[in-house]
Regions:
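Basic/polar N-terminal segments that are highly enriched at the extreme N-terminus
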Residues: 1-4
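Short, contiguous alpha-helical
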Residues: 7-76, 118-157
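Carboxylate-rich helix-loop segments that flank metal/cofactor sites and access channels
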Residues: 107-120
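A structural signal for well-ordered alpha-helical scaffolds and beta->alpha junctions
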Residues: 6, 17, 84, 91-95, ...
């Protein structure tokens, strides 16, 4: 694990998120809000994007030592984001913060422990580098769900 690897992985994470966000935006707000099934982590494409944004926000604030402003354990992190424009504005600001955080990383930071608790109260301690790899991996799962959702929305329209 290296800072260079982490930065490259996050560059891909940001690129892939933006690509899918652009597809959802091109389909429009009605499609973004269309429920496509309970088999997904979130019921609508917009809710899936909000979940992904919320997870990124939660972890950045945790790594910065700030109490997260989002509600952990709620799939959309307690966020009330009703439009793609609102989400894009927030996500752009978050990406800028993430890039700044990643720019300041040095190799030794990757091994610093991050302590916390799951929504169920289970205590954990993991090296920062492992958590920096976890977040884009978490998003990859949801991006794959979102691709299937978008196929269903497009076919169902």
């Amino acid at each position: 694990m290296s800072v260079e690897l982490i930065r490259e992985y996050w560059a891909y994470h940001h690129w892939a998120n933006r690509r899918l966000f652009d597809v959802v935006t091109a389909l429009g707000e009605p499609a973004a809000g269309r429920e496509v099934g309970k088999q997904f982590s979130e019921p609508t494409p917009r809710a899936m994007l909000v979940h992904m944004y919320g997870a990124d926000r939660f972890w950045l604030e945790t790594w910065q030592g700030r109490p997260p402003a989002v509600v952990r354990g709620d799939p959309t992190y307690g966020l009330d984001i009703r439009t793609l424009d609102d989400l894009r504005r927030r996500w752009d600001a978050l990406e800028a913060e993430q890039r700044g955080y990643l720019t300041d990383l040095v190799e030794i930071d990757l091994w610093k422990p991050v302590d916390g608790a799951t929504p169920e109260g289970k205590i954990f301690s993991r090296p920062l580098g492992m958590l920096l790899l976890h977040v884009p991996t978490h998003a990859a799962h949801h991006r794959s769900e979102l691709c299937t959702m978008l196929t269903m929305v497009k076919v169902g329209s």
